[in-house]
Curated annotation (Swiss-Prot):
Reaction(s) this enzyme catalyzes, per UniProt: a purine D-ribonucleoside + phosphate = a purine nucleobase + alpha-D-ribose 1-phosphate; adenosine + phosphate = alpha-D-ribose 1-phosphate + adenine; cytidine + phosphate = cytosine + alpha-D-ribose 1-phosphate; guanosine + phosphate = alpha-D-ribose 1-phosphate + guanine
Entry keyword annotation includes Transferase: yes
Family (UniProt): Belongs to the nucleoside phosphorylase PpnP family.
EC numbers for this chain: 2.4.2.1, 2.4.2.2
SUPFAM superfamilies, sorted: RmlC-like cupins
Gene3D superfamilies cross-referenced by the UniProt entry: Jelly Rolls
Organism encoding this protein: Hydrogenovibrio crunogenus (strain DSM 25203 / XCL-2) (Thiomicrospira crunogena)
Protein name: Pyrimidine/purine nucleoside phosphorylase
Enzyme class: transferase
InterPro entries: Ppnp (IPR009664), RmlC-like_jellyroll (IPR014710), RmlC_Cupin_sf (IPR011051)
Keywords: Glycosyltransferase, Transferase
Length: 104
């Protein structure tokens, strides 16, 4: 899906790591939400409350998922799942565009 229809976008950005990571929240009529974001090159760690599916739209990253010891390389068109109440590491090699879907 390359676009979303009939949604509400929260105007204020979610900004992390001194502006190197930012996203916008997209709210859907069914109560679900996603964030669309941009990651600048660097290494970051994020915590989750809800389970997430991170879809890479552009760029190259390595991710270290909870319970894993080996980094996984991903690029545009690939995705990874993160369990609720966990942390994951992400090493952004090139500017990365992503869509994060939150799973209840």
């Amino acid at each position: 899906m390359s676009q979303f229809e009939n949604v509400t976008v929260v105007k204020a950005a979610n900004v992390y790591y001194d502006g190197k990571v930012s996203s916008r929240t997209v709210l859907f009529a069914d109560g679900s939400k996603k964030t669309l974001g941009l990651l600048l090159p660097g290494e970051y760690e994020f915590g989750t409350e809800a389970a997430e599916i991170m879809e890479m739209l552009a760029g190259d990253v390595d991710v270290l998922l909870p319970g894993e010891t080996k980094w996984q390389s991903l690029s545009a068109g690939e995705s990874f799942n993160v369990p609720a109440n966990s942390k994951f590491g992400i090493n952004v090699k090139t500017v990365a565009d992503y869509c994060c879907s939150y799973i209840d």
